[in-house]
Structures are given as C-alpha cells and as structure tokens.
From Swiss-Prot:
Signal peptide: 1-31
Originating species: Newcastle disease virus (strain Chicken/United States(TX)/GB/48)
Sequence similarity: Belongs to the paramyxoviruses fusion glycoprotein family.
Region listing for Fusion peptide, in residue ranges: 117-141
Residues at the site labelled Cleavage: R116, F117
Subunit structure: Homotrimer of disulfide-linked F1-F2.
Record's keyword annotation contains Lipoprotein: yes
GO CC annotations, alphabetized: host cell plasma membrane; membrane; viral envelope; virion membrane
This protein's name: Fusion glycoprotein F0
Record's bilayer topology term: Single-pass type I membrane protein; Single-pass membrane protein
Keywords: Cleavage on pair of basic residues, Coiled coil, Disulfide bond, Fusion of virus membrane with host cell membrane, Fusion of virus membrane with host membrane, Glycoprotein, Host cell membrane, Host membrane, Lipoprotein, Membrane, Palmitate, Signal, Transmembrane, Transmembrane helix, Viral envelope protein, Viral penetration into host cytoplasm, Virion, Virus entry into host cell
Length: 553
C-alpha cells in the first residue's frame, strides 16, 4: 500500500527537501542506546535510513513479444510461432482496445470529453465504479498518448532488430528502451545450437519457451486484460516481461546498484501499459520511478516493548513505536506517509511529534522516568530475541535452560531477565528451543525494578475499575458532607445572624478593654503597696537606730 494522503495542502517537494537538508546539517545523529533500556522492557529492534521521494521520473519499455529467427530456420519454428502469435493477439487485444478507448476519449472537448473519459474507464471495470486511483492512472495514460504514437512510428524498425536491448531515442520525449526476452533466448541459446539441432528439436525448444512466456504474460496481465487503469504493473511483473534487460532502463534513469534492491522492495517502481500493436507484437509500458533524496543524518529507530513484572502486576512501557533523532532532538516519527523496506523508509513528507519530558528522559537512559501501562494480557509473548540473546519475563513463563540444564529464576523486583550464551547455551521457552549466540556486555544494565509510581492505568477495564473506586470515594465523601450538614442544621441560626455577631464582637472588645484597665490598675496598686512597705521599713530602721544610740549614752 502507498502512503496515506494528507488532508492538508501538501508541502512542495523542493521546500520539503530543503528543510530536510537543513535539518540533516545540524549535527550527526546518534541512534538511541538500547543497552540501558533492555532491562526495563524497551527493546531497540533496529534503525532504518529516512529518505524523501516523489514519483517524477518516467521512461518507456518497448517489449518485443515476437522474436526474430534466422531466415534459414524460420520454417522449423513456424508452427509454434504462429500458434504463439495467435494466442498473443487473443490475450492482449482487449488490453490494446481498452488503451485506445481511454486515449481516444480526449478527442471531444467540453463536458462530453469528461463523460467519455470516465465512461472509457468504467467500461473495463467489473463493478462499474471508477476509483480515484483508476482515474489518475487513466489520466497518466492519456498524457503518454503522444509518446506511444512516436513509438508506433518506429515499430517496424524495432520489430526488425535482432538486438535483445535497443535504446530508442528518435523523436521521443523520454527515454525508451526496446527489450525482448524471447529475442534474448533466441540469441543466447537457439543460434548456438541451431547448426547441430534438427528441425524437430528447434520447434520443440521454441515451443516450450514460448509457452512459458505466455504463462508469464497471463500472470502479469491477469487483472489488466480488460482495463489498463485497474492496477499498476509491479517491478516483479516488469522483470518477468523484460528479463534481466530491465536493469538497462533503470541504470539509464539513474538508479544506482546501491539503491536498486531497496527500491524494488519498496514497490515504488511501477509500470502502466500505454500501447499494444498486434501487427508487430510490440507492447509499450511507461515505467515510473521515484526521485529520492537521501537524508544522511536522519534515521528511524524502531522500539518494541516487553511485558515486565511490577509490584502491581504485568505492564508494558509507554513509548512510541518509531522515533527519529537529529542531534540531541528525539521526536516520534509518523510512518503513515512512508513506505518501509528492510533498510530504508521512503516518505512523501516528514511528520514528527514532540514527546513529553518524561518519555524523552526515559529514552535517553533514565529508566526511572519510564511510565508503564497495565494493558498487557497474560497471553502476551513474555520474551524477545535480540542479537542472538533473549530478554524474557521469567515470572510469566518458565525459562528452562537445556544446556547447561537448569531453571533460570528472576529475582524479586526485577522487571525482566537478560539471558545470553554466558548463562545458557540452549534455552527452552514455552516449548520453543533457542540456541543463543549473543552476549550482553557490561554496558547492559540489569536488575532494574519498576516502582509503583511508574505504573498507570490505561486499559478500558482497569480504568472502569479505578473509576468505580473513585465513585465509592465520592459517595463516602458525600455521606460525610451530609453528616456535617445535619450537624450544622442543629445550630441556632439566630445566634449566627449578623447583628448577633456584631454584638458579640462589641462585647468582646469592651471585655478586652476592661480587662486591660483592670490589669493596669492592679499593677499600679501593687507598685504603690510595695512603695509603702519600703517607707515603713525605712522608718522602723531609723527608730531602732535612735533607740540604740540613746541606750549607749
């Protein structure tokens, strides 16, 4: 399937390439280090190069279906060649008629042209409904009408050549290559043995090869016999038609050997029949190739999560499936606009989403910042292979080591177990036997525990349970509020009126004033009493001294 069309205005290709190239020049990208994340149940499964493309290059393949035999040997293979020619005409004439109907539908102007155009497409569609893709393909077929006419102008010279690959350039607006898989067979095999082979052997050889090619043609054009706009021809179908000669056209269009295998796997190289001539048995196919821009410093990193053990049950990490990193910036990558191959991503546009600080910190190696969801069921596969080793949750399954024999136990609090050839050479998990060849070095963190605060609820059933608990708490709170209201209702409202409160405040202030005055008066009286006591004591002492003096005299 192709990339999902955007609902917004598409970004122009040149602007997108410029922006992407600016991003790629920021600084070299470092892929996410999966070693500290593995023990937390987050496994980096691989990286892919990110490319941006647009389908802008086209070229034509002229398939020569009928080979030319040496003049002195034509009589030997006349019978199988005539039968093959008749079968070809019967097989491909509906295809040629459908092509001509669509191309001739543009001869009328105005609204009638549009009706004839759609009618020509629907005429070959079984359900009578023309999809947008079919209309687009038919429009491309009409645009190739002039090129098809130029090819037909050269059809005699193309049919007469004995070359298996012949570049056609006279009067054509785009590169065209004439190829003949059957001619290749005749040139490589038939001419070498014709001198030593009798007529019967020649007829048998040609007949067998032609029958095989007819089978391939039927397979290739099965869905397109009635409508060339129904389906595109895949790169595999084009190779079946042209054989190894297909590489010549791709090389001429600028597809390098380093890109060829990846582009073939992407399905971006497609073809549409644009002409069929039954007189010379020539089949014209317009090939569309993508124009690819490589973003050297951008890679997509794929993440998988493993169900880990926590004190709150089994849970899996909440991280994106695909992230991309440029310099120190890590963002989630939307691959819905991309086509994936084993090593590359081909995208019509680059769409990323920012991540929360917690997820960013988690993917940077701080596993204590990772959040987990209790959404994994008991039937989830509790193990994953990585580089010849195994990361397994040995609390969910029995990790049985066959060589050396023993049971691998997972310590309390550990999220998962990292098992390599150092601890077990042959491992049995759920009846599956794995021979381990990898090794977790010292940089891999182990014995990571998941805290309760890192586990949150995201599953529908779990959320319903938690909502039930919340509802119970709310009900209890409402009951307490009702009790409070009943107690408040018993309070005399008159005592809490505004006038009563003002009276209480005034009386309180007066009481405070009297209290302060009483305190001051008490302090004054105590001070005066102490002064009188000192005076009396002084008078007493004087009198005593005078009496002593009188006695001595």
């Amino acid at each position: 399937m192709g990339p999902r069309p955007s609902t917004k205005n598409p970004t122009p290709m040149m602007l997108t390439v410029r922006v992407a190239l600016v991003l790629s020049c920021i600084c070299p990208a470092n892929s996410i280090d999966g070693r500290p994340l593995a023990a937390a149940g987050i496994v980096v499964t691989g990286d892919k190069a990110v490319n941006i493309y647009t389908s802008s290059q086209t070229g034509s393949i002229i398939v020569k279906l009928l080979p030319n035999l040496p003049k002195d040997k034509e009589a030997c293979a006349k019978a199988p060649l005539d039968a093959y020619n008749r079968t070809l005409t019967t097989l491909l004439t509906p295809l040629g008629d459908s092509i001509r109907r669509i191309q001739e539908s543009v001869t009328t102007s105005g609204g009638r042209r549009q009706k004839r155009f759609i009618g020509a497409i629907i005429g070959g569609v079984a359900l009578g409904v023309a999809t947008a893709a079919q209309i687009t393909a038919a429009a491309a077929l009409i645009q190739a009408k002039q090129n098809a006419a130029n090819i037909l102008r050269l059809k005699e010279s193309i049919a007469a050549t004995n070359e298996a690959v012949h570049e056609v350039t006279d009067g054509l607006s785009q590169l065209a290559v004439a190829v003949g898989k059957m001619q290749q067979f005749v040139n490589d095999q038939f001419n070498k043995t014709a001198q030593e082979s009798g007529c019967i052997r020649i007829a048998q050889q040609v007949g067998v090869e032609l029958n095989l090619y007819l089978t391939e043609l039927t397979t290739v054009f099965g869905p397109q016999i009635t409508s060339p706009a129904l389906n595109k021809l895949t790169i595999q179908a084009l190779y079946n038609l042209a054989g190894g000669n297909m590489d010549y056209l791709l090389t001429k269009l600028g597809v390098g050997n380093n890109q060829l295998s990846s582009l073939i796997g992407s399905g971006l190289i497609t073809g549409n029949p644009i002409l069929y001539d039954s007189q010379t048995q020539l089949l014209g196919i317009q090939v569309t190739l993508p124009s690819v821009g490589n973003l050297n410093n951008m890679r997509a990193t794929y993440l998988e999560t493993l169900s880990v053990s926590t004190t709150r049950g089994f849970a899996s990490a909440l991280v994106p499936k695909v992230v991309t990193q440029v310099g120190s910036v890590i963002e989630e990558l939307d691959t819905s606009y991309c086509i994936e191959t084993d090593l590359d991503l081909y995208c019509t546009r680059i769409v990323t989403f920012p991540m929360s600080p917690g997820i960013y910190s988690c993917l940077s190696g701080n596993t204590s910042a990772c959040m987990y969801s209790k959404t994994e069921g008991a039937l989830t596969t509790p193990y994953m292979t990585i580089k010849g080793s195994v990361i397994a949750n040995c609390k969910m399954t029995t990790c049985r080591c066959v060589n050396p024999p023993g049971i691998i136990s997972q310590n309390y609090g550990e999220a998962v177990s990292l098992i390599d050839k150092q601890s077990c050479n042959v491992l049995s998990l759920d009846g599956i036997t794995l021979r381990l060849s990898g090794e977790f070095d010292a940089t891999y963190q182990k014995n990571i525990s998941i805290q309760d605060s890192q586990v949150i609820i995201t599953g529908n059933l779990d959320i319903s349970t938690e909502l039930g608990n919340v509802n119970n708490s709310i009900s209890n709170a409402l009951n307490k509020l009702e009790e409070s209201n009943s107690k408040l209702d018993k309070v005399n409202v008159k005592l809490t009126s505004t006038s009563a409160l003002i009276t209480y405040i005034v009386l309180t202030i007066i009481s405070l004033v009297f209290g302060i005055l009483s305190l001051v008066l008490a302090c004054y009286l105590m001070y005066k009493q102490k002064a009188q006591q000192k005076t009396l004591l002084w008078l007493g002492n004087n009198t005593l001294d005078q009496m002593r003096a009188t006695t001595k005299m």
